[in-house]
Amino acid sequence: MLEGWFLWFILFWVIMMVVLLSIGGFFMFRKFLKRLPKEDGRSELDWQDYYIENSRHLWNDENKQFLDELTAPVPELFRDAAKAKIAGKIGELALKEKVAKIDQQLMIKGYILATPKRDHTFLKRHLRDKKIDLEPYQTLLK
């Protein structure tokens, strides 16, 4: 039987592995749920890709640069996923409103709708730094 420090090392290692595998499994399961088709036959990620593809012609270089600025605080590992989610929401709004071109107002609205409330503090600070009026977005920010 195991005794002493080696027993504690093995127990610590087993607990650590279970915790790390649980955390990884949680995130993998969330991604799996987003890939599952809904009632309409498409998953959340399929719709996101659809909106990005169909609104691609509405984007210009300034909009892409502004999206890069908005996703700058996101860690590099998750930045592409964050950009895709935000761009998908902006594309959805653009297609539903049938706009001719995506403008900054639509991008801010899409960012607010696509991100959790905790990210809105960065948006407010960034918009103040760029001297953009927050008043039109107050109802969305609450």
Curated annotation (Swiss-Prot):
Membrane topology: Single-pass membrane protein
Protein location: Cell membrane
GO annotation, cellular component aspect: plasma membrane
Ranges that cross the membrane: 6-26
Chief localization: membrane
Keywords noted in UniProt: Cell membrane, Membrane, Transmembrane, Transmembrane helix
Pfam families (alphabetical): DUF2621
Keyword Cell membrane (UniProt): yes
Superkingdom as given in the UniProt entry: Bacteria
Subunit structure: Interacts with the N-terminal D1 domain of dynamin-like protein DynA.
Listed name of the protein: Membrane protein YneK
Organism: Bacillus subtilis (strain 168)
Phylogenetic placement of the source organism: Bacteria, Bacillati, Bacillota, Bacilli, Bacillales
Gene that this sequence comes from: yneK
